[in-house]
Amino acid sequence: MKNKLPPFIEIYRALIATPSISATEEALDQSNAGLITLLADWFKDLGFNVEVQPVPGTRNKFNMLASTGQGAGGLLLAGHTDTVPFDDGRWTRDPFTLTEHDGKLYGLGTADMKGFFAFILDTLRDVDVTKLKKPLYILATADEETSMAGARYFSETTSLRPDCAIIGEPTSLQPVRAHKGHISNTIRVMGQSGHSSDPARGVNAIELMHDAIGHILQLRDTLKERYHYEAFTVPYPTLNLGHIHGGDAANRICACCELHMDIRPLPGMTLNDLNGLLNEALAPVSERWPGRLTVEELHPPIPGYECPPDHQLVEVVEKLLGTHTEVVNYCTEAPFIQTLCPTLVLGPGSINQAHQPDEYLETRFIKPTRELITQVIHHFCWH
């Protein structure tokens, strides 16, 4: 029953008060079961059918799909339920208590992105879902902030094929139709230790890594020269050497050296092609030192994403908002949802607040976000 649904600010408050941190470090990682239960109960109260999906390979994480309406097509509104960990020493407020001050709603997940579900629920209390001519789906996913396991698994297992989808990440209500992907790898070189007084009796892993880095930097130049997408502020794939460690003493030949690096591919670049380019770049080192160099994934890769600029979803949203779509450098779940249907990233709050101490969402987004959700439901589910 709709009258059981709490007021907007109380929905928001309950979502923020329910911890759902995702982290690679097990001690910090939390289940999102409590948040999924909250959302499932509220959508059931609104008359939706609700399915809760365990996500394999996670620490008790779940997706939730709420659906209403019959037939094919329709609209999918999607978002993730998890937040990043917080630095207690840098927050001046309780991260799990929603507080309002000076036109801002503070709390962990207010912008990124629990708030989007509060907006959806509050908007739907004024929508007669029994009159929808096409289905409306609400997807809440797990582990976006780490592996994107929830969106990956959902996209691999669902038969759902909506007409289009909107992911409510904080974009300041500016529609995003493309972003780069992310590949992160560990390059590991195994040498042979020995006393530094006799270098010929060992194989110095740092020296081999120095050689490997030279080839990787040549690959960086190749990517910059070969691939371009002028809509991006950085219009080429970037390659970054982010972390290196090797050796344990000045008087020992280094036995192991490890490098962490990432590549941000443009939309349209396949992950297989990029991995092939990396292996090709490192081939001279591998051939000279067989069995001593390995490449492993640090995290599951995320492909680049693009919604066709001439798709109806882009045209409708640009008309509703009176603005043009943008492209961004950060990653979202859009590449996985895009395998189901054309997808835009569009939601309240600023990306500049994501992962920040004293995270907040400005209250000026409340009215236009409600209006936008109402308008897209009307357009894609009532016509």
UniProtKB/Swiss-Prot annotation:
This is Acetylornithine deacetylase. PROSITE patterns: ARGE_DAPE_CPG2_1, ARGE_DAPE_CPG2_2. The keyword Acyltransferase does not apply. NCBIfam families: AcOrn-deacetyl, PRK05111.1. Zn(2+) 1 binds at residues 80, 112, 169. Catalyzes the hydrolysis of the amide bond of N(2)-acetylated L-amino acids. Cleaves the acetyl group from N-acetyl-L-ornithine to form L-ornithine, an intermediate in L-arginine biosynthesis pathway, and a branchpoint in the synthesis of polyamines. The gene is argE. Gene3D superfamilies: 3.30.70.360, Zn peptidases.
